[in-house]
Structure formats: C-alpha cells, structure tokens
Regions:
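RNase H-like, Mg2+-dependent phosphodiesterase core
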Residues: 1-200
Length: 200
C-alpha cells in the first residue's frame, strides 16, 4: 500500500483582521493523478478556480482523502502571538488527521513542539512543491475568504472583500477615517501604531 502524505499550510498570518486558518490534507500521491484538475499553490490560481477545487474537495471528502481545518481565533493571536497560534493549530490538525506512519510536510521553516512521534518535515515553499500542501493551501484560502466576506458584511467600510484584511492603502485609509473595529488585531504593529496616532 502506498504511503500517505499529510500537507499542512496556513492562511491569514499577515492579515490585520480576524482569524488565521490552518488546513492539513491527507492522501496518497497517486490521488492527484486522477483529479479532474491540476492542484497548484492557491496564490497562483484565480478565485473562481480555487472555489471550484474547494467545493470538489468538500463534496468528496473522506472517499480516498481527508482534511482538517483549524481556526486560530483573533483573541488567541492577540494573547499568544500569531507564530505560536499557527504552530498550535498545525499541531492540532496533524494529531487529528494523520497516522504516525504518515509523512507530514509543513509549509515553512518551523515544526510545532511535541511532534516527536510523527514524521514531520518543514519545507519552505512546500505549497509549490507538494500536492497535499497545495490542496491544504487552497482549502485554507477559500475557507478564510468566506469568513472574511461575512466580516465585510458587518463592516463594509474597510473593503475586506477586496483586501482580505491585509494592510493595503485603502484598508489603512479606512481605519484612519472610521477607526479600528473589534475584528482588527490590535497587537499588530500597523494597527497599534494607528491606535496610538489616533489617540494623540
């Protein structure tokens, strides 16, 4: 029987708003040979195609692959910082999804503590190299986009549907004009600097 590989990626680390999302995706390598589409890094494909892939994975989940989504909430990001929260979410996703015989590949440079019983590797730009990580990246990206769209409907002045909460000029200008919302990560430097500037 072919080896199973688990790919792990996160989305939303650099956003000024809301949660970060971690996804772990588990399958055999041969799984990607029979897909009706090519899997690539979610940053390189358009929104419509990402959503099509996401819907396919969601509809057929559990047949010959599986995935696990973990949400790193804003309150924990502000309390423990984004790096620690993402690592803990990755650890949880691996424990919930993978078997100890699986090879686990994390996009990036860091491996969570307490993973000694698992075969875990960290690989920079793994979302460009490993299909399971690419799939995880797509799922995490679309899942987070849906969350951000819901936040946008509550706070449309910030145009989160266009900037996904990242520090674009239109987003920062909106914060200057309308202030900081309860969904902003106030410990992030661009936001904390704006808060300080607006309070003087």
């Amino acid at each position: 029987m072919s080896e199973y590989v688990v790919g792990v990626d996160e989305v939303g680390r650099g956003s000024l708003v809301g949660s970060a999302i971690v996804c772990a995706f588990r399958s055999q390598n041969s799984f990607f040979q029979v897909l009706p589409f090519d899997v690539s890094d979610s940053k390189k494909i358009n929104k419509k195609k990402r959503e099509e892939i996401y819907n396919y994975f969601k509809l057929n989940k559990g047949f010959n692959y599986n995935y696990q989504i973990i949400v790193g909430k804003k309150k924990f990001i502000e309390k423990f910082n984004i790096h620690n929260v993402v690592l803990q979410c990755m650890k949880r996703s691996i424990i919930l999804l993978s078997k100890k015989t699986d090879t686990v590949i994390i996009d990036g440079k860091f491996i969570p503590n307490g993973m000694e019983d698992y075969k875990v590797k960290a690989l920079v730009k793994a979302d460009n190299k490993i299909n399971q990580v690419s799939a995880a990246s797509i799922i995490a990206k679309v899942y987070r986009d849906k969350l951000i769209t819901k936040l946008h409907l509550k706070n449309n002045v910030y145009q989160w549907n266009k900037n996904a909460g990242y520090g674009t000029k239109n987003h920062l200008d909106a914060i200057y004009s309308h202030g900081v919302s309860k969904f902003h990560r106030t410990t992030y430097q661009p936001i904390s600097k704006l808060i300080k500037k607006l309070s003087t």
